[in-house]
């Protein structure tokens, strides 16, 4: 499960999810990826479920990059507890995802396999996603 090793503060404000993603909007490491179409919180369990779905379909072939990291803690109060008396205990970790952010990248497999693997992964996520390919500039891939 993905989570930070240590954090400065155990509890965080929820924050706003306005606008589009600032960075990470293009496929850089792999050949194919899925891009978020909506904004949402994605939990570390959803990320792990999507990763397992992809790698199982690819039969351990190819390489997968996870481009998001759950660095934001969310809290919850126990069931049947009255309002007030402080903020709840940390419950889990989420990644804040905005539209345009590339979530996962794949390389080393054919486009058909990548499309299906990423489709299976997208079913594990709470947002609409879109399949994207690496854009080639001037006939060459943008690798440095």
Curated annotation (Swiss-Prot):
Keyword check for tRNA-binding: yes
A single GO cellular-component term on record: cytosolic large ribosomal subunit
Superkingdom per UniProt: Bacteria
Record keywords: Ribonucleoprotein, Ribosomal protein, RNA-binding, rRNA-binding, tRNA-binding
Any GO MF annotation of the entry: tRNA binding
Cystine pairs: none
GO biological-process terms attached to the record: translation
Pfam families: Ribosomal_L16
SUPFAM superfamilies on file: Ribosomal protein L16p/L10e
PROSITE patterns named in the record: RIBOSOMAL_L16_1 (PS00586), RIBOSOMAL_L16_2 (PS00701)
Xref: InterPro entries: Ribosomal_uL16, Ribosomal_uL16_bact-type, Ribosomal_uL16_CS, Ribosomal_uL16_dom, Ribosomal_uL16_sf
Biological role: Binds 23S rRNA and is also seen to make contacts with the A and possibly P site tRNAs.
Matching NCBIfam families: rplP_bact (TIGR01164)
Family: Belongs to the universal ribosomal protein uL16 family.
Subunit-level organization: Part of the 50S ribosomal subunit.
Protein's recorded name: Large ribosomal subunit protein uL16
Name of the gene encoding the protein in the UniProt record: rplP
């Amino acid at each position: 499960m993905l989570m930070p090793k240590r954090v400065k503060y155990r509890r965080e404000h929820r924050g706003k999810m306005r606008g589009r993603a600032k960075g990470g909007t293009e496929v850089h490491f792999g050949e194919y990826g899925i891009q978020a179409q909506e904004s949402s919180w994605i939990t570390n369990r959803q990320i792990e479920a999507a990763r397992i779905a992809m790698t199982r379909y690819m039969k351990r072939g190819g390489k997968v990059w996870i481009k998001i990291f759950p660095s934001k803690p969310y809290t919850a109060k126990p069931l049947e507890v009255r309002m007030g008396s402080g903020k709840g205990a940390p419950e889990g970790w989420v990644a804040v995802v905005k539209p345009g952010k590339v979530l996962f990248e794949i390389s080393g497999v054919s486009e058909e396999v990548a499309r299906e693997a990423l489709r299976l992964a997208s079913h594990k996520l709470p947002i609409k996603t879109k399949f994207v390919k690496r854009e080639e500039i001037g006939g060459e891939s943008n690798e440095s």
